[in-house]
């Protein structure tokens, strides 16, 4: 899930002051931001109180089921079209993708109320850890399911740095070195590093990213004999069954 944190209120106030916004509509997210405790109903109420303390009027609020889902967000904003039209601006308590989706769904100025910090694992309620950089060139098959790109502050791929001491990280001194953990887990599984990992291919993650699942389905649905029809599934093997 995308982990978010509250944006500095002074920045939000400055954004709204810049356009002279006196009325604001608040939009939250029912998924990641709600779980992270940054964009659910309690946080919307806190933002509402802060806006009112600044002398602004909150025309209404809503929580989209998934803020980054364009179709769902457009449907949700249509339900509140009157309140949104009455607002000078929309404050979005969601990740950056959610903010952009709301901005694509309304014609009012849209501002982020949160900062997106990382793609995180839920360790337990209210505790999150960054585990993946979404680099597009995964090495977990070689590192026993521990990502050195993310869990090593220096992003080293082939072993610890010279600053590792007694198995602990030089940078985050209260944490075990990622490469020590990788070595231990490989040993526990009876595995060993068969080769050194090549330097990261950062071209595997070009910005902005885009994946079109429909494109593959449409290609595979073409009649036999068509040069564009491969019949291959997601991993290039047997065709996938369309369960949609």
Give short role names for the model-derived ranges.
Residues 68-70:
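ATP-dependent adenylate-handling ligase core
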